[in-house]
Amino acid sequence: MSCAGRAGPARLAALALLTCSLWPARADNASQEYYTALINVTVQEPGRGAPLTFRIDRGRYGLDSPKAEVRGQVLAPLPLHGVADHLGCDPQTRFFVPPNIKQWIALLQRGNCTFKEKISRAAFHNAVAVVIYNNKSKEEPVTMTHPGTGDIIAVMITELRGKDILSYLEKNISVQMTIAVGTRMPPKNFSRGSLVFVSISFIVLMIISSAWLIFYFIQKIRYTNARDRNQRRLGDAAKKAISKLTTRTVKKGDKETDPDFDHCAVCIESYKQNDVVRILPCKHVFHKSCVDPWLSEHCTCPMCKLNILKALGIVPNLPCTDNVAFDMERLTRTQAVNRRSALGDLAGDNSLGLEPLRTSGISPLPQDGELTPRTGEINIAVTKEWFIIASFGLLSALTLCYMIIRATASLNANEVEWF
């Protein structure tokens, strides 16, 4: 597995954290208690006997508004330069107040300026209250912030109800409104401090995950370096062991030239006169040019898989890096027997001149306890550790994301808006 591949879960965790950090963009607003507003609207249409009455239960008092009951006729701003003015943000905003009206309530739409500006302009024209309807149809009323607006009452309602009332005003139909204090809604328990606590917890979890990840890479580098170092030392030992093996030149009449004699197991060619052959401790014969490269890499006989390092007594317990499947346990049990029988056969063969074994000058190699695990074992262990580390980090990111989204959903009901 490449480093880029391993970094995939880390990038995914970072992306999950970034997404969660962008989600509660407005979660910095203080969680405040608020009061609901119960609004009764009475519409007196000309030519209709009984007035039309409906109730709005989803109103909300502004944070800085007096929580009091008020009643009055609803008025909308006059058009400016022939264009309807529903926002009340222009300094030239005016209201037409009939002389017989003592108390009136301004109806304005949210947007384009702060709540404080809207409320202040209505108060300047002696409105007793301001009803601001939302500018998004699917959004609930929010708690408005408008410090310094005095004793004027400010309430927000939904866009749907606001436009219903505005439609009557545009037809010059009289609309009366009564605003009463509803229920006090306490602040939610999940506050900004809780978000900070969750964030700190996530950071701690990520630090632990990162520490494990760094430990993994250090161990991986150590395993790789140790394996490469042992392979180099094993190769050097194999070369020195090869130099201890007997070689001779095939002559006319030797048994190797007999048609019934086994061919070289490496190149599958028969032996010819003047061929240089190598005799292994197991008594198998091969072309020197064929078997030397094999022994340098595998240090075992191509036919019986005898470990020449063990057979020659150079490194008794060093396993070779032979990728061909064979029974290592069986070979270890019968190692001593094979070595004695092989050396005895070689010594009794008059056609072979076996040199005495010399082990001096060969650098000691690590024993079994010092060797690293096999490649398969390392890969299994590393894959398992990496899966745990990656899963831990990703789970931490997703857990934080879930908690922040839940916290944001709780805070949405208590959001404080300025405009």
From Swiss-Prot:
Ubiquitously expressed. Highly expressed in leukocytes. Not expressed in erythroblasts. Its EC number is 2.3.2.27. It comes from the Eukaryota. SUPFAM superfamilies: PA domain (SSF52025), RING/U-box (SSF57850). It is an enzyme of class 2 (transferase). Residues 105-176 form the PA domain. It catalyses: S-ubiquitinyl-[E2 ubiquitin-conjugating enzyme]-L-cysteine + [acceptor protein]-L-lysine = [E2 ubiquitin-conjugating enzyme]-L-cysteine + N(6)-ubiquitinyl-[acceptor protein]-L-lysine. Disulfide bonds: none annotated. The modification Phosphoserine is found at residue 341. This is E3 ubiquitin-protein ligase RNF130.
